[in-house]
Amino acid sequence: MNFEGLDPGLAEYAPAMHSALDPVLDAHLNPSLLQNVELDPEGVALEALPVQESVHIMEGVYSELHSVVAEVGVPVSVSHFDLHEEMLWVGSHGGHATSFFGPALERYSSFQVNGSDDIRQIQSLENGILFLTKNNLKYMARGGLIIFDYLLDENEDMHSLLLTDSSTLLVGGLQNHIIEIDLNTVQETQKYAVETPGVTIMRQTNRFFFCGHTSGKVSLRDLRTFKVEHEFDAFSGSLSDFDVHGNLLAACGFSSRLTGLACDRFLKVYDLRMMRAITPLQVHVDPAFLRFIPTYTSRLAIISQSGQCQFCEPTGLANPADIFHVNPVGPLLMTFDVSASKQALAFGDSEGCVHLWTDSPEPSFNPYSRETEFALPCLVDSLPPLDWSQDLLPLSLIPVPLTTDTLLSDWPAANSAPAPRRAPPVDAEILRTMKKVGFIGYAPNPRTRLRNQIPYRLKESDSEFDSFSQVTESPVGREEEPHLHMVSKKYRKVTIKYSKLGLEDFDFKHYNKTLFAGLEPHIPNAYCNCMIQVLYFLEPVRCLIQNHLCQKEFCLACELGFLFHMLDLSRGDPCQGNNFLRAFRTIPEASALGLILADSDEASGKGNLARLIQRWNRFILTQLHQDMQELEIPQAYRGAGGSSFCSSGDSVIGQLFSCEMENCSLCRCGSETVRASSTLLFTLSYPDGSKSDKTGKNYDFAQVLKRSICLDQNTQAWCDTCEKYQPTIQTRNIRHLPDILVINCEVNSSKEADFWRMQAEVAFKMAVKKHGGEISKNKEFALADWKELGSPEGVLVCPSIEELKNVWLPFSIRMKMTKNKGLDVCNWTDGDEMQWGPARAEEEHGVYVYDLMATVVHILDSRTGGSLVAHIKVGETYHQRKEGVTHQQWYLFNDFLIEPIDKHEAVQFDMNWKVPAILYYVKRNLNSRYNLNIKNPIEASVLLAEASLARKQRKTHTTFIPLMLNEMPQIGDLVGLDAEFVTLNEEEAELRSDGTKSTIKPSQMSVARITCVRGQGPNEGIPFIDDYISTQEQVVDYLTQYSGIKPGDLDAKISSKHLTTLKSTYLKLRFLIDIGVKFVGHGLQKDFRVINLMVPKDQVLDTVYLFHMPRKRMISLRFLAWYFLDLKIQGETHDSIEDARTALQLYRKYLELSKNGTEPESFHKVLKGLYEKGRKMDWKVPEPEGQTSPKNAAVFSSVLAL
């Protein structure tokens, strides 16, 4: 409402006028109103007022049910009945919001919305509440958590808001425009100009938007264009309030008089059918608020600020007998609202009290309200009391610190003796089956325990204490869960054992003796590691992705290219997919498909990993196609979900994976509809297994694949000819075959698993029958011999029985397009190639041979929750780059475990624990069809000046000078580097029984600031990069003491730093690495690990290792700077510019002391003196008040004199 022209003392609220009220001293406060209200020290009421026993509510007549204090002494500025729950929301002039539950007005929540401005409008949504202040729109949960905070322009003065639909909001005020805001993206989508400024009230019907102006006019606007259709000049002074119901519009306001503005007692009523005014309605109160209350009739409730309320019909006469008084505690009523059910009225006064009037003893605010979620009571667990009267009370209930001294309760040495544990009995089955030679027995190792590790458990103790154990000691009797001992060791889920040194003492070479790089598994959502490896070893995909670069912040193609580059550079060391998975978590489609797992679900294996990785496979191919498509078509840089997969010719990903099809729908009326489409992968469709299970019918894999590609099905579909849904025969025909055939196996139930198992048994019998006596019973080879057996040329090696078991999948398939749009698919063997000739010659006739390149497998293991691994056939180009040899070999990729395997192992699926999930077949000679050259897309322009994301950043706050064109770094140049980090997830650790701590999962760090300083030239030591990295993830610890990062520094809305994206800074560092600069810093190994960069060792000059002696502790940068440079750094917090500059100076000092590395013996003496001084000082730098720092000359002269 508008108070323009009124007495300023009544229209405005001055905080000084409303100090904290004392019920005894304030004459305006009704003592009976607050006699049961408990006030906290700040003067806020804590409980609602109970209804007096004498109050009697008459049905159909509004009477006061409850009064409650929202905030003592602070006027109520707005009230609103929640449209979804039984709640009443109240906002105050002090920016505080309070909610009350139910007609009893029990306090539900109370929180501060704005620290300086009053709350002007409240709107309830399904998931939260919208609060409008002067220039701020805040969306908060009903408990008080902020969902979003949208800052408007500082010059705006907003008064009204209108929710047009579930995701669109109109906001108006005293300016000459109305803003449209999209609540999904929290962005301004439209700004409508208003001819008459000052929109303080807005309403909506199914015909118009209604805008009430401070000039006294009401404008009716079109719902689509927002143009003025009609305008009512209601009052000559100002508009106070109006409401719309049906075809009537009623308004109250102020008229101009000789002495100023006066409240007009005539309500203006307009007929919206004829668009003209009808007879004004004279009332007996000074109207300030009005609302239609359409229950039985279209009644109007007219409220005055003094507390008088009158009901009347808008087309009749007002009756003075229909007036009742609200009895406000303060002198004025400030707000009024009606519930959606019309059973309750809410009034707020100038003293912070809220009055609830109802027409029934048990009213409801909404016709259909959902249940309200209440906070759980705070329960504090107390330690159980100890009863000292009990003689047998164990003293172990009292916690005592760990000590090595003798305790009073220790037994004397004379009364105790060591008793060795009895050896557990040998399993009876092992004793029965072992072979004896003399008195020595021999038995095969059942492989159920680790070497030299046997749990001590006696039989009698098992029955008494461990009867819940489900795993017996003997291998016999484990038929209930056979996979507990069937899973081969290399297929089990691998974990990293962390020590106090982190990953430095973990031997990754034990798990990977090749030069290929594995991927670390401890990152959230790292279940896709195996699929990343599959995509990497597709040579056209690897080259294409590494050539891609766009400006989108979270582009999966860009991040995957950066990760592929790291895998190229690595020489057997595992890599991390931090940045890729970070971008993956921001894609809305990934979350909608359920691909984002919680840490608890991923660790426990609650999700179906096979189904999950198949959905991820479909998602990543579609997303890469979109990312590449957006770069190649003219409309660049659209949103992540802005385009759908439509044509295979739009991107190279489409050319590789896309299969063009024709979908034919034939109705029984004879009409046929043909629609062209494309797909990036196929899903296996299995035949009805009910008969095959009994008869053992043989299905070739090629038959099942053809049935899945050329799918025929009967379904109900719309027929345009019949104009109704009819039974339709839908047929899918292939028009163009893909270069890479991707197949999701969809083995999601025991039915599909039994089908694979049955077909493997039938294939085994046929293979044994085919080869006859040529099959050897056992053929074992050393691991190094598999390279020679992988793909012998010109020689057919007869397989062994073990190699034929559980095999149904062919290594090659042959596909041919027929003239009648059909497809022929058959299994292809090496013998077929010798008979029909090479596949290359037949491609001219539309015949293609696909070779199996990868299989992704789900490992079932209840102990670890299962895992995903991949068998990948690594091509010649990869071996040439990594090992300098030219051959092909199958490998097992299990996170950071990489091991060469026989090719038959890649197609052997024991359905008890090894279930196929995804298959990749590639056309033979695929690499020759594509350009495999990689051109680095990162240019020197990434180092030039760029704008900051922070709104409040000013040029005076700039802490660095960007490089000029004549300063571009060259190969061998020095660059000082330092990075600061924040913590996203805390470390998970457990305390062992011996008191040592074991790290289960390390803390997840994220880079927050990266600084690079010039290492030579006239500007040496001046930073040219000092980027703060904006993050959208929740930070649990800013580590301010060690990083210097404060809350708000990484928020683009309030930060004053030079804020940029991680991708932007990553590109700068990648360019410096690619050009060959040398980085100087302290502890760079951790910095590059968190940033997710792989840097060649000859480009890293780490002072933590330059000033280090073997088998000695690492020395901090602070101590080195004090000892060698007489500098005291890192006083209160760390500063990355200071640390990078100090590391450069230390490197110069290292060159000076070691004579550029030519005198290692003299430098060794310096290091000995450093360590001796450090031990004496306990490695602590003296405080300024204490002893002075030793001067360089004195320190080194004493060292050199040794």
UniProtKB/Swiss-Prot annotation:
Its main location: cytoplasm. GO terms for cellular component: cytosol; nucleus; P-body; PAN complex. It comes from Homo sapiens. Residues 975-1147 form the Exonuclease domain. The keyword Phosphoprotein applies. Residues 368-485 are annotated as: Linker. This is PAN2-PAN3 deadenylation complex catalytic subunit PAN2. PANTHER family: DEADENYLATION COMPLEX CATALYTIC SUBUNIT PAN2, PAN2-PAN3 DEADENYLATION COMPLEX CATALYTIC SUBUNIT PAN2. Changing D1087A: Loss of exonuclease activity. The modification Phosphoserine is found at S791, S1189. Binds 2 metal cations per subunit in the catalytic exonuclease domain. Catalytic subunit of the poly(A)-nuclease (PAN) deadenylation complex, one of two cytoplasmic mRNA deadenylases involved in general and miRNA-mediated mRNA turnover. PAN specifically shortens poly(A) tails of RNA and the activity is stimulated by poly(A)-binding protein (PABP). PAN deadenylation is followed by rapid degradation of the shortened mRNA tails by the CCR4-NOT complex. Belongs to the peptidase C19 family. PAN2 subfamily. Keywords: Cytoplasm, Exonuclease, Hydrolase, Metal-binding, mRNA processing, Nuclease, Nucleus, Phosphoprotein, Repeat, WD repeat. Residues 486-924 form the USP domain. Contains a pseudo-UCH domain. This ubiquitin C-terminal hydrolase (UCH)-like or ubiquitin specific protease (USP)-like domain is predicted to be catalytically inactive because it lacks the active site catalytic triad characteristic of thiol proteases, with residues at the equivalent structural positions that are incompatible with catalysis, and it cannot bind ubiquitin. It functions as a structural scaffold for intra- and intermolecular interactions in the complex. One of its GO terms (molecular function) is poly(A)-specific ribonuclease activity. SUPFAM superfamilies: Cysteine proteinases, Ribonuclease H-like, WD40 repeat-like. The keyword Phosphoprotein applies. Its EC number is 3.1.13.4.
